Amino acid sequence: MSAPASTTQATGSTTSTTTKTAGATPATASGLFTIPDGDFFSTARAVVASDAVATNEDLSEIEAVWKDMKVPTDTMAQAAWDLVRHCADVGSSAQTEMIDTGPYSNGISRARLAAAIKEVCTLRQFCMKYAPVVWNWMLTNNSPPANWQAQGFKPEHKFAAFDFFNGVTNPAAIMPKEGLIRPPSEAEMNAAQTAAFVKITKARAQSNDFASLDAAVTRGRITGTTTAEAVVTLPPP
C-alpha cells in the first residue's frame, strides 16, 4: 500500500516541503488513472472467459469444419451434445477412444467429430462448454455416467462421475434456457475433486522418475513410485 504524501515545515520557517509517494494517484485522475464510481459497477458488462472452456471463437471454427464434414446444420448442436454426453461415459482426455456413431451427425463417427475438435481446442475444453447441458440431460433421464461405480463413486454422488464436472458451474459454459435443474451439491463437488485427485495420483505412480536403471535403484520396479507411496492426504469423505 502506498503511504500518503507528507508535509514538513522547519521551525520558524514559512516554507513547507511536500513529499509525494511514487505510487500516489494524480490529483487529476484520467486515462488509466481514472477512479471508478458506483455507476461503473452497476452498468459495466464483463465478458466471461475461462482457459478451461472452449471459446465462442473455438466453436465457430469447429462449426465450420463440421459443415465441411457434412454434419447437418439443423442437428449440429444435438451432435455436439451427444458427443459430450458420450464423453461423460467414457472420459474426455486426449487418450480417450470414442465409440460408435451418434444419431445426429449424418453417419459421421464420434471419433471423427472429436478429431476435428482436437484441431481447434482440447476435447475436455469442448466438453466443459456443454457441461450444464449434459448435467440437465442426465438428471432429466436419471441416467448417470456409465462408469460411476468403476470410479468408486457412492450412489448419492453418481451424477458427478465425469471428468469435466467442473464445467457445470463454470460461467463460461453454455447454460440451458431454464438454467440448471439443480446445482451440484457440496458432497458431489467434493466427490468429483477427490476422484480427480485419485486419477492424477495413479497416473503419477505409473511414471518413471528414476535417474538410473540399476536394479539397486529401481528395485525391479518399472514405475518410479507405487500408488501407495504417491497417495498423500485425500479430502475427507
Curated annotation (Swiss-Prot):
One of its GO terms (molecular function) is structural molecule activity. InterPro entries: Pltvir_coat. PROSITE patterns: POTEX_CARLAVIRUS_COAT. It is found in: Virion. Pfam families: Flexi_CP (PF00286). Residues 1-28 are annotated as: Disordered. Keywords: Capsid protein, Helical capsid protein, Ribonucleoprotein, Virion. Disulfide bonds: none annotated. One of its GO terms (cellular component) is helical viral capsid. Required for genome encapsidation. Forms ribonucleoprotein complexes along with TGB1 helicase and viral RNA. Belongs to the potexvirus capsid protein family. This is Coat protein.
